[in-house]
Structure formats: structure tokens, C-alpha cells
UniProtKB/Swiss-Prot annotation:
UniProt region (Disordered), positions on chain: 1-24, 199-218, 331-385
Keywords: Nucleus, Repeat, Ribonucleoprotein, RNA-binding
Main location class: nucleus
Name of this chain's protein: Heterogeneous nuclear ribonucleoprotein A3 homolog 2
Length: 385
């Protein structure tokens, strides 16, 4: 139920004389599929029914000022975010929209970060952790459909990771945004679990054009099986440094089966891959994705490709859009209902090889961009609204 009528005034955090206690990232929703007629005011009018908003903005092309078909709302607390998500489906200006919990800049660089899935991977669980420990912990987030604690086929020994499937993708989004969880007195790392097909989809979204194999730089091909030693998250592998997610090349084994384990768990490859960082050489020739900070869908400099997308919104950068910069700051000159925002990079394409800036509250890469030879690519991926 909405917490108030359309005309109710939810005071900002400033009205109460203190800032919200919970991190902004946990209080923020991405809203996709907006009508091009939707304004900051009409977006706010709808979503403030479930709580007070500390920010609300419809993202617009910096030149034409036309809506890019998505926006963000930030509540004052996570409880209000939960209430809003529980009230789905949402219709704004006569159009059903697609709310999701916003993804952090750090997580945005990870393969499949923006895909909608109902299964999580739980890594780092100990030998004494049983299925009921996982059920007791995760059922507090939402309805569980299945739990799989992975074991060695021959010895029956637990392999140190598990999969949990829920009935709602929002439960997964809520869990993974927290990153670390304590289960049976042990710290565990939780990520979205993607099928091979989903990884290929994520790869295709990020890897349109440019050099390097499918969003892992050289030798990676997350999902391909390219590379000599260390397939699938195992020995020497690491999220695509060499080998692939479930790919066949080399000594690693497949997704959760055989070889040296999933993502370094249960094997000797080190947590999340050993190797030089997440994805080896990087997307576009330098360490890290996008050369010097091009976010998800941003443009990797140094010969890399732009590409990318967030679950398929607005193919091709949407109206020639700028380098929106994932989750943090729409910055530039754009203002929200609450006045000018902190500096960021929503100002057309970036230049000089830096595929996007990292400052501000919505920094990252929901846009096109790409300087220094990087390709422009897709903001929010495949379908227009």
C-alpha cells in the first residue's frame, strides 16, 4: 500500500536535520521503460507514494534534452525501496515501467551485472555449512525455490560454493548489492549466477565491435573456452583472464563441475581468479574495464570497443547519448528536482582515451561514449521505448 497520497509531502533528509543512515546506493532505484513524456515531477509524483525521495531524475540527452527513457529515484531508507518494489507493477504516465535496484559502479564492470536473474552464487562457504544454514539465512530476503550445495562427484566432499534460486529477481538484486554476507558464522561472497547462455548475452552486449575477445580483453572470452590453462574460474583463470566461464579450453572444467572449481572456490586459483584483476588484461588494452574508467557500456579507450547495455534499453546510445556513467552522477549541467547534482559525466561522449569519468553519485557507464579509438556502443542495450 502506498504510504501517502499523491499530494502528501515527504520531507527531505535536510528537513529532518540529518542525512539518511543507509548508503545511497542501497536506497536507489533505476527506472527503465519510461514514456518520453515523463518528467522529473511526474516520476516523483508516482514513486513518492511509497516514501520520501531524496532525489528523482529523468535522464536526458545533453544536446536535445529529450528523455533517454530511463531515470533514477532515491528514497530516504531501504524500507521504502522495499515497499516500492513490493508494489510492482508500476505505471507512470500510462506506461508500465521497469524498476530495479541500481547497481554500483564497481559491480557494473562485472559481467552480467545488469542482467535480470533469479539465481545467486554463494562462494566461500565452509565444510560445516549445510543447506539449512543457507535456507535460514536467505529466506529472510524472499521466497526460495531451490538450494544446491555443490559437492565433488567422486568424493562427496563439499566444494565450498552453492546456488540459491528465488522466485523474484528483485530478491537477487537486493542480496547482491550487499556483496558480503555472514552465513553460519562465516563470511561469504554472493554474486548473480549466470547460465552459459546468459553470459553469452552479457558478452554480446558488451563486446560489439573493437578488438579483444568478447569483453575480457585478450584470451578471455568469458564463456568461450578460449585459452590454454585455467578454464572456468579455476586455476590461473579468474573470470576470463584465460579460459572461460564454462568454456572448454585448458585445465579448468566447466560451470560448477569438474576441474578446479567455480570462480576460484574449491580449487587452487585464488579467490575470483588469481590473475591480474577481474578479467585479466582489461577491456580495451589497459588494466581494468574501459581503459581508464569507461563504465558499463562506456567506451574503452586504446582500441577497445564501446558497446554494452543494461538489459537492453535503447540500443546504440539512445539519441546519440553521452557517457552516462553508471550509478553515480548524472552531473554536468543536468538538474534534478533537488537542484544541480554533483559533478559527474553526463555530457556527451568522452574524449582522449578515458571512456568516462568516475565522479559523482551516478558515475559509471549507462551510456555510450568511448574516447581514444574506443567505439561508441550501446546505452542500455537493445530495445527502444
Amino acid at each position: 500500500m502506498p504510504r501517502g497520497g499523491m499530494d502528501d509531502h515527504w520531507p527531505s533528509s535536510d528537513d529532518q536535520g540529518h542525512e539518511p543512515k543507509e548508503p545511497e546506493q542501497l536506497r536507489k532505484l533505476f527506472i527503465g521503460g519510461l514514456s518520453f513524456e515523463t518528467t522529473d515531477d511526474s516520476l516523483r509524483e508516482h514513486f513518492e507514494q511509497w516514501g520520501k525521495l531524496t532525489d528523482c531524475v529523468v535522464m536526458r540527452d545533453p544536446q536535445t534534452k529529450r528523455s533517454r527513457g530511463f531515470g533514477f529515484v532515491t528514497y530516504s531508507c531501504v524500507e521504502e525501496v522495499d515497499a516500492s518494489m513490493s508494489a510492482r507493477p508500476h505505471k507512470v504516465d500510462g506506461r508500465v515501467v521497469e524498476p530495479k535496484r541500481a547497481v554500483s559502479r564497481e559491480d557494473s564492470a562485472r559481467p552480467g551485472a545488469h542482467l535480470t536473474v533469479k539465481k545467486i552464487f554463494v562462494g566461500g562457504i565452509k565444510e560445516d555449512t549445510e543447506e539449512y544454514h543457507l535456507r535460514d539465512y536467505f529466506e529472510g530476503y524472499g521466497k526460495i525455490e531451490t538450494i544446491e550445495v555443490m559437492e565433488d562427484r567422486q568424493s562427496g566432499k563439499k566444494r565450498g560454493f552453492a546456488f540459491v534460486t528465488f522466485d523474484d529477481h528483485d530478491t537477487v538484486d537486493k542480496i547482491v548489492v550487499q556483496k558480503y554476507h555472514t552465513i553460519n558464522l562465516h563470511n561469504c561472497e554472493v554474486k548473480k549466477a549466470l547460465s552459459k547462455q546468459e553470459m553469452q548475452t552479457a558478452s554480446a552486449q558488451r563486446g560489439r565491435g573493437g578488438g579483444g575477445s568478447n569483453f575480457m580483453g585478450r584470451g578471455g572470452n568469458y564463456g568461450g573456452g578460449d585459452g590454454g590453462g585455467g578454464g572456468n574460474f579455476g586455476r590461473g583463470g579468474g573470470f576470463g583472464n584465460r579460459g572461460g566461464y564454462g568454456g572448454g579450453g585448458g585445465r579448468g572444467g566447466g560451470y560448477g563441475g569438474g576441474g578446479d572449481g567455480y570462480n576460484g572456490f574449491g580449487g587452487d586459483g585464488g579467490n575470483y581468479g588469481g590473475g591480474p584483476g577481474y578479467g585479466g588484461r582489461g577491456y580495451g588494452g589497459s588494466p581494468g574495464y574501459g581503459n581508464q574508467g569507461g563504465g558499463y557500456g562506456g567506451g574503452g579507450g586504446g582500441g577497445g570497443a564501446g558497446g554494452g547495455g543494461y538489459d537492453g534499453y535503447n540500443e546504440g546510445g539512445n539519441f546519440g547519448g553521452g557517457n552516462y556513467n553508471d550509478f553515480g552522477s548524472y552531473g554536468g549541467q543536468q538538474q534534478s528536482n533537488y537542484g544541480p547534482m554533483k559533478a559527474g559525466n553526463f555530457s556527451g561522449r568522452s574524449t582522449g582515451g578515458s571512456g568516462g569519468s568516475s565522479s559523482g553519485p551516478y558515475g559509471g557507464g549507462y551510456g555510450s561514449g568511448g574516447g581514444g579509438g574506443g567505439g561508441g556502443g550501446g546505452s542500455y542495450g537493445g530495445r527502444r521505448f
